[in-house]
Amino acid sequence: MSRVYNFSAGPAVLPEEVLKEVADEMLDYNGTGMSVMEMSHRSAAFQEIIDTAEKDLRELMNIPDNYKVLFLQGGASQQFAMIPMNLMKNKVADYIVTGQWAKKAYQEAQKYGKANKIASSEDKTFSYIPDCSDLPISPDADYVYICENNTIYGTKFKELPNTKGKILVADMSSDILSQPVN
């Protein structure tokens, strides 16, 4: 069988040595005699996986100790609801809509309060990032939301917008760990 290389958005090519290690550990993870999929999520072996993942992520991303690292299920779509449910204290948020994911986040936020579309590139099928140099940030907005990298349309924020002191919520699921984040 010849290898097929997938360079599309989402799952992509992995080195063969990584695939072989995963295959070897599928039946016996780290000498435990079982697969990770068979472990209790309360076991010491599984807790070690979580602790190591958090330690490595903190190191790679330079995450300070006063920040929490959460490993959550549900993916980006669940976060579209969790963000306004947890951050929309004044029931107002501003959204910069630059693609399908930001549009979905904006639509979901409307269920929890007033979501303002303060900039958008939907007029040209999300083919550009709008000028964010002087955004009409709502005085009572709890946060400003962006999707930092749009894999569907091939657009990306070159610099983060000035949110005038408001919390910036950035969906970075498609390019996390590709650059330093402050």
Please give the residue ranges for each predicted region:
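A general structural motif
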Residues: 2, 66, 90-92, 140-141, ...
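A glycine-/small-polar-enriched, mobile loop at the entrance of the PLP active site in fold-type I
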Residues: 3-54
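General beta-strand structural signal in soluble alpha/beta enzymes
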Residues: 6-8, 69-73, 95, 117-119, ...
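Active-site phosphate-binding strand-loop segment of PLP-dependent enzymes
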Residues: 10, 109, 121-176
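Short, well-ordered alpha-helical microsegments
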Residues: 15, 79-81, 102-103, 152-154, ...
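Conserved N-terminal alpha-helix of the aminotransferase class I/II PLP-enzyme fold
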Residues: 34-79, 100, 108
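PLP-dependent aminotransferase-like
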Residues: 77-144
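A short alpha/beta connector and helix-capping loop motif
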Residues: 180-182
